[in-house]
Amino acid sequence: RLPDFFSKKIEAPVYPFESPNFLPSAQNKQVNLVKSVAYNVFRLHKYMSSVRYINRMIKETGADVVINFYELLTGLTYLFCRPKAVMVCIAHQYLFLHPDFTFPKENRLSLASLKFFTRITAIGAAKKLALSFRKMREVPADGIVVVPPLLRKEVLEMTPTKGDYLHGYLLNSGFGEEICSWHKVHPSIELHIFWDKKEVLPEVKVDSRLSFHQLNDTLFVRYMAGARAYATTAGFESV
């Protein structure tokens, strides 16, 4: 689902479409690759309909520029339909394509797959804006420009305070088990953890020192402003 702040502040029509997804494991701690591939292959006909829909909406709206936030189907739209509108891609993942970016020593197949997926999202792009806190040179031949992430006005207007708690974000809610285990060893430390766990209350209060919160941009920023430290399993934008 779309974040509330996006829906409220975009001030433009929003047209949803179905897109491929990675499905989590039963414990919701990592991607289930086999399950994800099978699920997405079964829904290929829907994704092709989405590609046609994206192409149609680009034409009907008379878009001058298409801004793509790491969406696979937008890249495929430019591969198969060749829209005339200029496309600009924005994501921290485009830093993976920068020749000066150093990867940790990981499985070569996994890294090759990640780069391949990233390139598909940017098929036909005039520019790839790679988000990074570190300055790096442009790569004109590949259309890569490294830019810092933008901060929302609400973040800049927030006044920092000295809170006595740790703040965190879990991309996969299954890691809540690890948080609870750590909390048992360190019960005196107050924790406010955000997640996107379905079918739970906005706040799950384990005890007086540990709370899990559903994603809420206003509350998230408020807790971040007073945290002693911040920990996250993912979410470059929050960092």
Q: What function would you assign to each model-found segment?
A:
Residues Q30-V65, L73:
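Conserved nucleotide-sugar donor-binding subdomain of glycosyltransferases
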Residues R152, T159-G226:
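Donor-nucleotide binding loops and adjacent catalytic segments primarily
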Residues C81-V146:
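Active-site-proximal region of nucleotide-activated glycan assembly enzymes
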Residues V66-C81:
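An aromatic- and histidine-rich active-site surface loop
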Residues V66-F69, L219-V239:
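A donor-sugar binding/catalytic signature common to diverse glycosyltransferases
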Residues V139-A141, V145-V146, L150-G163:
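Acidic anion/phosphate-binding donor-loop and adjacent secondary structure
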Residues R1-D4, Y70-L73, L131-M136, I193-P202:
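Short, polar loop motifs at secondary-structure junctions
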Residues R1-H45:
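Conserved nucleotide-sugar phosphate-binding/catalytic loop shared by glycosyltransferases and other
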